[in-house]
Curated annotation (Swiss-Prot):
Pfam families: CheD. GO terms for biological process: chemotaxis. This is Probable chemoreceptor glutamine deamidase CheD. The keyword Ligase does not apply. It catalyses: L-glutaminyl-[protein] + H2O = L-glutamyl-[protein] + NH4(+). Keywords: Chemotaxis, Hydrolase, Plasmid. Probably deamidates glutamine residues to glutamate on methyl-accepting chemotaxis receptors (MCPs), playing an important role in chemotaxis. InterPro entries: CheD-like_sf (IPR038592), Chemorcpt_Glu_NH3ase_CheD (IPR005659), Cytotoxic_necrot_fac-like_cat (IPR011324). Its EC number is 3.5.1.44. It is an enzyme of class 3 (hydrolase). GO terms for molecular function: protein-glutamine glutaminase activity. Belongs to the CheD family. NCBIfam families: PRK13487.1 (NF010013).
Amino acid sequence: MIEFGKKAVPRAAMPDTVRSDSGMTAGAMATLAQSAASTHAYYDTTFSRRAMKVLPGEYYVTTEDLMLVTVLGSCVSACVRDKLLGIGGMNHFMLPSRNESESILSPSMRYGTHAMEVLLNQLYRAGARREHLEIKVFGGAAVLAGMSTLDVGERNGKFVLEFLRSEGLPVAAKDLFDVHPRKVYFVPSTGQIMVRKLRSQGSAAELDSEAQYASKLSRSIADKPASRLQLFT
């Protein structure tokens, strides 16, 4: 288990937890939408904490003392928090596989841009400040069967780093690429992150979910992509 930092912060009165999917806007990504009413809450006995699973194509932003948990193969996840207020969130996404330009304006790159911007926007809505953000990124492994030659994981990892660089947002820590799936545990209220490397055969169900997500992305990216969202602070 790899641990990425821990820092206690004062707690203040905050808005309610925000939950939604990062499955794009109407049209292009409609088939990816997860029900906003569905929840993935559970009690994690290993860490004795209330926890919330974040599945492929989703994000979760919270002001509560929750642990956010996801399993990553080729997908990437940004764990972002306001280090003064303890507001934080996590996303889980990948770029659609396309034989196209790597321009930030290409359809697949716009998908990744949206996945990052919707998380940041929801954090700002909850009260987070850009200048107080602490960002750690994970995933991008070469694990999806039949997709290794496309360097899907590497492409995802490079995208998230380039997006943050272009936005002027520093990366506090990262654990990207390699060939092993990862299980990521993130506690926004403290900043503590634990990463467990998994054996591929031991996480078949999670990777199957990611493979289905990749297939849906490939089919839906043909629709007209949404325009870039505007960030606000």
